[in-house]
């Protein structure tokens, strides 16, 4: 049984959704003066929106809500606030890649309004998971009905690193297993996260393992094998 279903998102998906989102904002006749990207997932969508709508002012703030892929923090919080500026009287669009629980966008919106109560703030996202989100963004490109973990093209190595670590730790707790072949890892990734994860180019698995080795999480014993 798949523990966490995943869905691979392509660059073409991102470009299409960003274009759709920009079109909805333009049609609403509410044009932002400035875009605030929620780091880190909102960076690329926000930049694409600026390009589509001819907006020059783009800043960011970082909200921590998913410290590890597909594992939510107990409470979302602002890690790095918006830089010092005056947003009062401005139309501010807060952008993220996806609204799943809604916590990240809500805390970002409340943060901006608490500092600049006279700002006209709206929110936008490429995707909105309507069945689980506690908050509906003002603008979205694509409504998702069934929850899955979306693997964005800017997050593939990080997701794989987190998934591999989780698998190795849980399997160690259950059976004491510490040595893994690449084939075993691939099979376990498919078992835990579904066959969709096999669409990720195999080169990213190598990058993920290299990062984990640099961070002291795994040790490569020989070609094709790793140790926790």
What function would you assign to each model-found segment?
Residues 1-228:
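PRPP-associated nucleotide enzymes
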